[in-house]
């Protein structure tokens, strides 16, 4: 969300000898300043730190969780690093941190009362509020009568944020 401001500040500070980084939120850094500034540049430019897939899922009866597990197994068989989160059990901050770290994100959710299962909807709004971008996204929707979660998830993470959306063929 504040990537432009952070990038501008780091550009101005590039000629200075920085001995300490004192963020408003988080640790005060006195060592490895170059490495810390590099991290801030990654985060400010929304550049993934690693190639890999975050799979975040919300499941009511276990079927969406099963689909997420199958996807994770197939990706791992291909040698792709994955991490999974049940958004009903995992604090959103863990998923947000992983989303900033990895290059690809999969969101799998059940349609619940003609909407997105609540914890997934909250996570997606949190990611949108962080202005996370420059990721490849895929969505898995699960529903019987009138599945809508896929469409609704795409709407929350819609442009102007810069994402590449994968579509099933």
Residue ranges and their predicted role:
Residues 91-162:
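Helix-loop-strand module that forms the ligand-binding subsite of alpha/beta enzymes
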